[in-house]
């Protein structure tokens, strides 16, 4: 879907595919980048640092720099899959392969002993006039910046009911990818407006004004991937005049 040239920040890539029954990604380390495997339906065996648990979609598991991961589909059905990669060095990818497909893991932890991301809509909370938009959005930050060691800043989940909107705003220090999890709606980036639906992905570069509107029916559910120019630096300016900040700049004490 995207590669290291798609954004100005350190996105490595975003891949989207199916994992067929008996398929997966073998066990490997990353030392200069971070990844997160996500499944959107079914279930799969996720491994982080040699410990394996079964997760059911929609869920993901971040793998930080210096750690290892794998995924295996032991079920009889294909699983919808995404892999997000963010690098420490722009354009640089690394992987140290352990030659272990993780296809016959006998001992699985019923409760994962690694970090996970759950995109269950029941976890969302109402936010009226989100970014000065119309109606009441449902929003949550699924993963914050301190989960990661790179400039990966967050994963947000946003549900816009029919005709509700995420108001016009921009970021000076953050780029985003909006991925449509469910439903349909309208996206505007700068002066371009397009209809979007499940499976679409919209990149938003630095300083680009953007807004979204939920369509009829079930509205518009989005996963938002945020990557900063520097670790822990995040900002939001509200439109249309961008005369003020919704949130002050935040700088990590550990950056």
Whereabouts are the PLM-identified features?
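Asparagine-centered strand-capping/turn motif at beta-strand->loop junctions
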Residues: 71-75, 212-216
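Glycine- and acidic-residue-biased ligand/ion/polar-headgroup-sensing regions
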Residues: 32-44, 173-185, 190
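Conserved short histidine dyad/triad with adjacent acidic residue
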Residues: 2, 15-30, 139-143, 156-171
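Short acidic-glycine-tyrosine-enriched beta hairpin
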Residues: 50-65, 191-206
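A short, N-terminal "cap"/entry segment at the start of jelly-roll beta-barrel domains
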Residues: 1-11, 92-152, 167, 236-255
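A short hydrophobic beta-strand segment most commonly corresponding to one strand
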Residues: 62, 77-93, 203, 218-235
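Structural motif
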Residues: 43-45, 52, 68, 78, ...
